[in-house]
A protein has these predicted regions:
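Positively charged, polar, low-complexity stretches
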Residues: 2-89
């Protein structure tokens, strides 16, 4: 059984080491900022999101593909976080 700390560590690592650099730069900072504060339900959704294909996720975030219903709220939060982060830079 994976401990909570091990799960967070695994999910952060998977957020930074995706299949594409674009998704590394989107999910990595988001995970650093929010994953430690997520409740169990939010962690389950984020963990499932990490199983999705990077090209599909990027297309959903960019509005080029319809968001999967189970991820729509989370992807909207990630998109807002990323846009805010880039606006500061």
């Amino acid at each position: 059984m994976e401990t909570h700390e091990a799960r967070i560590k695994r999910m952060r690592m998977r957020s930074w080491r995706r299949g594409t650099k674009e998704m590394d730069l989107i999910l990595g900072p988001y995970a650093d900022a929010y994953i430690a504060r997520m409740d169990e339900d939010a962690l389950n959704v984020y963990d499932a999101l990490l199983e999705e294909n990077d090209q599909d996720l990027l297309a959903m975030i960019l509005g080029q593909q319809e968001m999967l219903p189970q991820f729509s709220k989370l992807l909207a939060e990630i998109e807002e976080f990323s846009r805010g982060r880039l606006a500061k830079g």
